[in-house]
């Protein structure tokens, strides 16, 4: 029980802090493209932080990271990066916190039951989010009623289901690979906008999606297969 409580507190606090930093950053500067790119920088930070924990990635993994970052840039940054603003630092801190959350899940998920860890994590997030809302905002019942569906979807699907699957999936997965797979959210976001909201995808954005998907596939290809391809060529 103590280990489960500790795991839930650590993972939940990191998830709350990362989400709060992201939402505050977007509120200050509502550029979703830049927010998506900076937040997804955990794809690089996770293996970098992993070096300090004795996890040495091979060349295949690092090449995949570079390809993924290039793909994210093409997909998200349509008009260049622009100047660094205060909100950017918040979004970068969000990426750092999400990196720590992925590493924490990697550490705790093999030690405790995944579903119980998920419940503990979201209990902590709920308590800390409610406390922050009461301290820094003045929410009303009318606001909750008006935004009930988005709140329920974000709480149940985007948070509850998605992060439970993350915990279960990371039990036997390198956290660097997990971060690569999770950065596919940028791809699905773009594709969802195209399919459901009829938003146009430029050739640059499509190429960015292809690069990110290729990076995820490359990172998970067995080394033996790569050696065979190299010899055949």
Task: Annotate the PLM regions.
Residues 1-33, 38, 74, 155-173:
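Specific transmembrane alpha-helical segments of multi-pass solute transporters/efflux pumps
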Residues 6, 10, 60-67, 86-93, ...:
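Hydrophobic alpha-helical transmembrane segments of multi-pass integral membrane proteins
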Residues 10-13, 17, 21, 70, ...:
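Glycine-/small-residue-enriched transmembrane alpha-helix faces in small-molecule transporters
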Residues 25, 51-57, 108, 117, ...:
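Hydrophobic/aromatic residues within transmembrane alpha-helices
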């Amino acid at each position: 029980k103590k280990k489960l409580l500790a795991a839930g507190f650590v993972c939940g606090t990191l998830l709350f802090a990362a989400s709060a930093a992201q939402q505050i950053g977007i509120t200050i500067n509502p550029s979703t493209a830049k927010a998506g790119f900076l937040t997804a920088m955990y794809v690089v930070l996770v293996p970098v932080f992993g070096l300090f924990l004795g996890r040495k990635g091979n060349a295949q993994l690092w090449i995949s990271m570079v390809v993924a970052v290039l793909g994210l840039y093409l997909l998200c940054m349509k008009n260049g990066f622009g100047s660094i603003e205060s909100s950017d630092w918040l979004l970068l801190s969000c990426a750092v916190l999400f990196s720590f959350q992925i590493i924490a899940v990697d550490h705790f998920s093999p030690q405790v039951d995944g579903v119980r860890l998920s419940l503990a994590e979201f209990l902590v997030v709920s308590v800390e989010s409610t406390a922050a809302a009461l301290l820094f905002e003045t929410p009303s019942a009318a606001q909750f009623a008006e935004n009930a569906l988005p709140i329920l979807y974000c709480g149940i699907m985007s948070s509850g289901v998605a992060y439970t699957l993350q915990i279960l999936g990371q039990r036997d997965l390198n956290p660097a690979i997990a971060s690569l797979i999770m950065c596919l959210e940028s791809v699905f976001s773009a594709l969802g906008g195209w399919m459901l909201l009829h938003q146009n995808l430029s050739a640059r954005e499509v190429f960015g999606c292809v690069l990110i998907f290729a990076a995820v596939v490359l990172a998970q290809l067995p080394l033996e297969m790569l050696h065979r391809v190299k010899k055949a060529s």
